[in-house]
Amino acid sequence: MAELSAKLKWYEEQFRLAKKKRFGASSEKTHPDQLAFDLFNEAEVLATPEGEEPPTEKITYERRKPTGKREARLDHLPIETVTYELGEDERVCSCCGGTLHEMSTETRNEIEIIPAQAKVVRHVRKVYACRRCEREEIRTPIVTAPMPKPVYPGSLASPSSMAYVMTQKYVDSQPLYRQEQQFARLGLSISRQTLANWMMYGAKWLSPLVDRMREHLLKQDILHADETTLQVLREPGKSAETQSYLWLYRTGRTGPPIVLYDYKPTRNGAHPREFLSGFKGYLHVDGYSGYHKVQGVTLVGCWAHARRKFDEALKALPAGQSKTETAAHQGLAFCNELFAIERELKDVSPEERHAVRMERSKPILEAFLAWLQKQRSRTLPKSLLGQAIAYSLNQWDKLTAFLKDGRLELDNNRSERSIKPFVIGRKNWLFANTPRGAKASATIYSVIETAKESGLNPFQYLKYLFEQLPQLPDPKDPEALDRLLPWSSSLPLTCRAPQS
């Protein structure tokens, strides 16, 4: 009977959580009414002043609304001015017949959208010979005018068209079949197979750059990692329904911003061990055990995952039940205290952040651990609260690792934000046809997301790369590639994204 009751309670909990996820707010922010449980400010909350406070004078004033912000956002755009004025024969005063003079102007701004346009650029290279040598029947030297090498020999692809298709798919999540339709409206008959070939060939140019970015990434001592699923239809030895994986590796708050994606057919921990071979330092991860195979690193856990489990346990409670005194709310409050401290330390130095954490965060962790150990024996292991408690206890060494260095972060949200563009794109184009296509997509995403992290315009940067990479004598020359990296000071200003 007790077992049936426990199962019923579990199913009811799962139902309430599923209902909340489907119809409720998706935010994990704590409701203001839940903040009454204050763990470490009890003395301040309960204290009463010994003496009467001096009266305070309330000063009220009206803030002037700042002006010019809308116009300032347009400063980076070209301006076309259309002037409306009276002709000379119209500048006559209706009262006295005198000549009217210009007194002032009235101005309004409008944004005009210019749809995508296409044109043919015909490259004509002239060949020269010497007339005198021709007349005197001497060996005639032939001189050919220099011409840039094409980005895709034998095709209609240009640096701009290849960059445009990549940006549409990997930044704006437009599948190739939709781009095929868009080009048709421009009067261009370009099949999605042709567009796919452009992407594959472009990824070949970008691959040495991504390899160079990986070399820089492995030199850092703090990294973040995450993984998500990807369906590849023609994976050798696997059915079309089987999930493959896209792994993410990126730098932290220090060092150059680098975001790399790596396609692998499985979720085996050997993949991050291989990719991160040679890396020594701290690795921010979630609770997946596969990262334990990475040697020579200190794993740093994610408090956002731990907090989310207590948040789900709280949301799954019956609607009429008071939540402020529940164990789920207490566990969530511990997590909120830690995040509140981190918000205060957002702009301080790593040394100061480490000192404050040891002074304020460490006591919270010690109290939380004692609370978890006490609650574990009181809670059903399979309940959402039991799972939240078990997760925190099982991950405790990783969850407390952020105390070791002030540069470390409380959560792994940095990697989750970086993997989100791929997840959004996946909802639109759903799958990759082949492993080769999946690897090409990982390469392109790596360049684009790193460029965005560096404040670059993805289209302009890709266009610049496809103009420069074919001209390199050695496309794998480290020094030449370093000048093309997203954080390089050698990049032209045209690659920069306009500041909003």
Regions found by a protein language model. Name each.
Residues 69, 90-91, 101, 125-500:
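Catalytic center-proximal scaffold of phosphoryl-transfer enzymes
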Residues 1-156, 224-225, 231, 251, ...:
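Short, flexible loop/hinge motifs at secondary-structure junctions
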